[in-house]
Amino acid sequence: MTTINTLVFDLGGVLIDWNPEYLYSKLIPDEKERKWFLTTICTPDWNEQQDEGRSLKEATEHLVGKYPDHERSIRAYYDRWTEMLGGPIHETVEIFRELKFGPAGKGSGGPGAARLKLYALTNWSAETFPVALEMYEFLHWFDGRLVSGEEKTRKPFPEIYRLLIERFGIEPAKGIYVDDNIRNVLPARELGFIGIHFRTPQLFREELVGLGVL
């Protein structure tokens, strides 16, 4: 069996709880109206354009011009962006801690610390990611990070996975990639990674135990 020496984490939905509902349930209490707003105006596809490098200002002004009656709610998307963060997904952060430092905590070593390189591959705006770096200490534990907004490309486009491989010298056949979006797992599998579709921290832990890395 090939020895696994690399694990690549997605961030949102795996290590960090992020959901626009946390903010917009306060701004738009009516569920039907809120769902319409988040699927018609500030949509996931629109947000991903910022993940791919478009400026927050340009994106916001474009929507305000198109939907002036919803200006307040549109501007809130990035003005109050931190209110979409639900905090760390603590059980997954604990798995990360064990892989990085060993089960007893920082400085203890352990199998993960001895042989696993740990990286992050995230769809995230280059303008908001520095805020997350200040908020979450564990984002500094990685051996390397690749942020889509800084690279002007994003998952699931194959080029961002190839960039990850080239930049950090990763051998995909010896690597694991974990993401809560199966759309983003499939390209990693095609390039040779063991792709894990993240559902819960407990299932993730069980899969890592089965692969012999925990």
Task: Indicate where each model-derived feature is located.
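Hydrophobic residues in well-ordered beta-strands that form the structural core
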Residues: 17, 120-122, 197
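Substrate-recognition/cap helix-loop segment adjacent to the acidic, metal-dependent catalytic center
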Residues: 28-31, 92-102, 114-150
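N-terminal helical cap/lid subdomain that shapes the substrate entry/recognition surface
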Residues: 2-94, 125-128
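Generic structural signal for small/hydrophobic residues in well-ordered secondary structure
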Residues: 10-13, 53, 120, 145, ...
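Asp-based, Mg2+/Mn2+-dependent phosphohydrolase catalytic module
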Residues: 1-4, 125-126, 130-214
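Surface-exposed amphipathic alpha-helices with a cationic face
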Residues: 96-103, 112, 165, 185, ...
